[in-house]
Regions:
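Short cysteine-rich clusters marking metal-coordination/redox-active sites
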Residues: 31-34, 47, 55-58
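Short intrinsically disordered terminal tails
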Residues: 1-5, 85-92
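Short metal-binding segments enriched for Cys and/or His
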Residues: 56-76
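Short linker/helix segments within small regulatory modules
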Residues: 42-52
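Short functional micro-motifs and their immediate structural scaffolds
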Residues: 37-39, 63
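A broadly conserved sequence feature marking short terminus-proximal activation segments
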Residues: 1-26
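Residues immediately within or flanking Cys/His clusters that coordinate Zn2+
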Residues: 26-31, 52
Length: 92
């Protein structure tokens, strides 16, 4: 089940490839960083500030070096508020 996870100030939703595919109406889920396709049950993270879904490996690499900028907060919140209900996550 999709859930919001702690990632500093970033708004991130952990979800399976299948949950993301259902939310966006896609037939395939590909990591937006490495380009690899993933099975329905594989977990990854939707990163609202990037409006991307990363596999767990790419997410861990990204979050270790990511820097939050306050000027991105409005777009990040808008993206999160759009996808969170589609993934079954309550907007905060």
């Amino acid at each position: 089940m999709a859930k919001q996870i702690e990632a500093g100030k970033f708004l991130v939703i952990e979800c399976t490839a299948g949950e993301l595919m259902d939310a966006v109406g896609s037939d395939i889920c590909i990591c937006d960083w490495c380009g690899q396709p993933y099975h329905l049950s594989d977990k990854g993270c939707y990163i609202a500030v990037l409006n991307h879904w990363y596999c767990k490996k790419c997410y861990e690499e990204w979050v270790s070096r990511a820097e939050w900028y306050p000027e991105d907060a409005d777009v990040e919140r808008r993206n999160f508020n759009f996808y969170a209900p589609r993934l079954g996550v309550k907007c905060q």
